[in-house]
UniProtKB/Swiss-Prot annotation:
PROSITE patterns: HTH_DTXR (PS50944). GO terms for cellular component: cytoplasm. Iron-binding repressor of the dipheteria toxin gene expression. May serve as a global regulator of gene expression. The gene is dtxR. This is Diphtheria toxin repressor. Its main location: cytoplasm. One of its GO terms (molecular function) is transition metal ion binding. The lineage of its organism: Bacteria, Bacillati, Actinomycetota, Actinomycetes, Mycobacteriales. Signal peptide: none annotated. Belongs to the DtxR/MntR family. It comes from Corynebacterium jeikeium (strain K411). It is found in: Cytoplasm.
Length: 240
C-alpha cells in the first residue's frame, strides 16, 4: 500500500514539475523522469485517471483534476519544506538534498509542516529558489506577526519577471541574476555540487553566455556549463 501511494505521489509531483518548467506533461516525459517503461507509466496513468486524479487530453497531455492538483501541491510543499530543513538546519550538501527530500515528502505529516514554518527563517521558497506552493493551507500555524510578510513574499514571487536561461542563449556574456534551479537539475549531483562550490545560488549575479557545450555560468569563483537540454531549468532575470 505504501508503494502504491508513493507511486501516485511521485507521478503527481512529476506532472507538477513539468508544468513549472513549461514542458507539456506527457506520459513519455514521466517515463524519462522516473526511469520507468512506457507500459508501466500507461498503466499507472490509467489507474490515476480512474481515481479521478487526472485526465488524458486529446493532445495526450495530462491534466490534473482539482483533487489531483491539491494532492500534487501538498506533495511539492512537503518536498520543498523538507529541502529547506535539510539545507538550512541540518546542513546537508546541496547535491544530496533533492534525493533525501524525495523520501521525506511521502512521510511528512501535516503537523510537521506547520511546525516547520514556525522553525524555518525562510519558507516562501525552497533553497533553490522555487516557490513553496499551498502555504495558505498552513497559515493557521504561522504567527500573526509573520502572515503579512509571508503573503507579501508570495505576491512578489508571482510578479518577478523571470526567463528560462535557454530562452536567452546570449552569444556574448550578459549579467543575469539566478532566480531558481528546477528539480530536473537537482538530480544532477555534479552540477549541483558545482553550483554550490562556485557560490551560484538564487539571488547571485553571474555572467551567462551560450557556448557549443551549453550555457556557461561564471563569476569570480569560476565557471560551469549547464547542458543545453537542461538550460530551461534555470530561471534568471537580466541585470540592467
Amino acid at each position: 500500500m505504501r508503494d502504491l501511494v508513493d507511486t501516485t505521489e511521485m507521478y503527481l509531483r512529476t506532472i507538477y514539475e513539468l508544468e513549472e518548467e513549461g514542458i507539456p506533461p506527457l506520459r513519455a516525459r514521466i517515463a524519462e523522469r522516473l526511469d520507468q517503461s512506457g507500459p508501466t507509466v500507461s498503466q499507472t496513468v490509467a489507474r490515476m485517471e480512474r481515481d479521478e486524479l487526472l485526465t488524458v487530453e486529446k493532445d495526450r497531455s495530462l491534466k490534473l483534476s482539482a483533487q489531483g492538483r491539491a494532492l500534487a501541491t501538498a506533495v511539492m510543499r512537503k518536498h520543498r519544506l523538507a529541502e529547506r530543513l535539510l539545507t538550512d538546519v541540518i546542513g546537508l550538501p546541496w547535491e544530496k538534498v533533492h534525493d533525501e527530500a524525495c523520501r521525506w515528502e511521502h512521510v511528512m505529516g501535516d503537523e510537521v509542516e506547520v511546525q516547520l514554518v514556525k522553525v524555518l527563517s525562510e519558507y516562501a521558497t525552497s533553497p533553490f529558489g522555487n516557490p513553496i506552493p499551498g502555504l495558505d493551507e498552513l497559515m493557521e500555524g504561522i504567527p500573526d506577526s509573520e502572515r503579512a510578510e509571508l503573503q507579501q513574499k508570495i505576491d512578489n514571487l508571482q510578479v518577478v519577471t523571470s526567463q528560462r536561461a535557454s530562452d536567452i542563449e546570449p552569444p556574448e556574456p550578459i549579467q543575469v541574476k539566478i532566480l531558481s534551479i528546477n528539480e530536473i537539475i537537482q538530480v544532477e549531483h555534479k552540477l549541483m555540487a558545482k553550483f554550490h562550490a562556485l557560490g551560484m545560488r538564487p539571488g547571485s549575479v553571474v555572467d551567462l553566455v551560450a557556448t557549443e557545450d551549453g550555457l556557461e555560468f561564471s563569476n569570480d569563483n569560476g565557471a560551469m556549463v549547464v547542458p543545453e537540454e537542461l538550460g530551461h531549468a534555470v530561471r534568471v532575470e537580466k541585470v540592467n
